[in-house]
């Protein structure tokens, strides 16, 4: 995996140590530059509805929204990776990636690396499929709210204890 393009853009965020290394005006300008490059302000872009906004509007609870946002952020990182050789929009993409990194990953390089690692797992590889199925139960248990999991473990322990005493 190539992290160099991400790491270079994000090192400034880490060095500055701020929650956001770019002013919102700078990020907005770079987004407008990308819109211009892709002609994304054209009226036909909205044909068929929004790509992500309607989905985001459905989810109000922060934990639910984070799940959807992680998929959307993954899409943008894949888009920027696909366009990485385009010198015309490189600065805009680097600025936006840096801001996404600061906001979504709280400037944590480890979180970013794990996120990229998970998003780049190949599902058509048999070895990967076998590992994924092997880990499925633990992943499913990790999805449970921790208080429910503890209650279940406690009740299973007390049931086992009663059976042993009979």
Curated annotation (Swiss-Prot):
Q: Which residues are glycosylated?
A: 39, 44, 106
Q: Where is the signal peptide?
A: 1-23
Q: Where is the major localization of this protein?
A: secreted
Alphabetically sorted, this entry's keywords are:
Antiviral defense, Cytokine, Glycoprotein, Growth regulation, Pyrrolidone carboxylic acid, Secreted, Signal
Q: Which GO terms describe its biological process?
A: adaptive immune response; defense response to virus; humoral immune response; positive regulation of autophagy
| A GO cellular component annotation in the UniProt record | extracellular space
Q: Which domain of life is it from?
A: Eukaryota
Q: Which residues carry this modification: Pyrrolidone carboxylic acid?
A: 24
The entry's note on the tissues where this protein occurs is: Released primarily from activated T lymphocytes.
**Example GO molecular function:** cytokine activity
What Gene3D superfamilies does UniProt report for this protein, alphabetically? 1.20.1250.10
Q: What subcellular locations does the record give?
A: Secreted
Q: What does this protein's UniProt record list under function? A: Produced by lymphocytes activated by specific antigens or mitogens. IFN-gamma, in addition to having antiviral activity, has important immunoregulatory functions. It is a potent activator of macrophages, it has antiproliferative effects on transformed cells and it can potentiate the antiviral and antitumor effects of the type I interferons.
Query: What's the subunit arrangement here?
Result: Homodimer.
- Similarity-based family: Belongs to the type II (or gamma) interferon family.
**Protein name, please?**
Interferon gamma
Lineage runs: Eukaryota, Metazoa, Chordata, Craniata, Vertebrata
């Amino acid at each position: 995996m190539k992290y160099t393009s991400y790491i270079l853009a994000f090192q400034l965020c880490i060095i500055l140590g701020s929650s956001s290394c770019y002013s919102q005006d700078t990020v907005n300008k770079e987004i407008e530059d990308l819109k211009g490059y892709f002609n994304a302000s054209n009226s036909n872009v909205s044909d068929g509805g929004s790509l992500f906004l309607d989905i985001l509007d459905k989810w109000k609870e922060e934990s639910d929204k984070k799940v959807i946002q992680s998929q959307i952020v993954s899409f943008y990182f894949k888009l920027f990776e696909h366009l990485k050789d385009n010198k015309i929009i490189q600065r805009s993409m680097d600025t936006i990636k840096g801001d996404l990194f600061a906001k979504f990953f709280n400037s944590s390089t480890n979180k970013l690396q794990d996120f990229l690692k998970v998003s780049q797992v190949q599902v058509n590889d048999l070895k990967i499929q076998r590992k994924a199925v092997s880990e499925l139960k633990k992943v499913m248990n990790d999805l449970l709210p921790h208080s429910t999991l503890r209650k279940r473990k406690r009740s299973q322990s007390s049931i086992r204890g009663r059976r042993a005493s009979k």
